[in-house]
Regions:
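PLP-dependent amino-acid enzyme catalytic core
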Residues: 1-185
Length: 185
């Protein structure tokens, strides 16, 4: 997936109506000059809302009418549920059987249909991909999706706007979507 700065700028334009920039705060207990980007203050308490919302907003009307599906054990699931509630799009969210009830309830609170399936994420994702193909829904990957990465990249744009002289940015890495977006910005 080739992500561009233009993708991230478009994502920021889409998200402005729905999300406020998150604060950057000093963390003196971590050392001189360490700042934290407070993504936990987003509506779903995670950066994942940015990518999920951008991915749903980037869909055309026909794709939204068919609905979206994803596989996630928590934060991305809640982000997709919020995004589809905000855009009046149907969402099916597959979650591994062991997903904490708090995460399942979060999905349902935002209007998503939570389906527990699979003993691990790979099984859950494979089933979501199968259903997307068979039922004509759009699969929104938690990490391997251009629009999801672009949404995450808006964090990088905000950092550059809020801290223009930033020397380095430390980013947690799991699936790679967050770091891809921030590094591109």
């Amino acid at each position: 997936i080739m992500l561009t700065l233009a993708d991230i700028v478009r994502a920021q334009q889409r998200l402005t109506r729905y999300l406020q920039p998150t604060a950057v705060e000093s963390a003196p207990e971590l050392g001189a000059g360490v700042l934290l980007k407070l993504e936990n203050t987003n509506r779903t308490h995670s950066f994942k809302i940015r990518g999920a919302l951008n991915a749903v907003l980037a869909l055309d009307d026909a794709a939204r009418a068919r609905g979206v599906i994803t596989a996630s054990s928590g934060n991305h699931a809640q982000g997709v549920a919020y995004a589809t509630q905000a855009t009046q799009t149907r969402a099916t969210i597959l979650m591994p059987k062991h997903t904490p009830q708090k995460k399942v309830q979060g999905v349902r609170r935002y209007g998503g249909t939570a389906v527990l399936f699979g003993d691990n994420f790979d099984q859950t994702e494979a089933e979501a991909l199968r259903r997307a193909r068979d039922e004509g829904m759009t699969f929104v990957s938690p990490y391997n999706d251009r629009q999801v990465m672009a949404g995450a990249g808006t964090i990088g744009l905000e950092i550059l706007q809020q801290v223009p002289d930033v020397a380095r940015v430390l980013v947690c890495v799991s699936g790679g979507g967050l770091i891809s977006g921030i590094a591109t910005a």
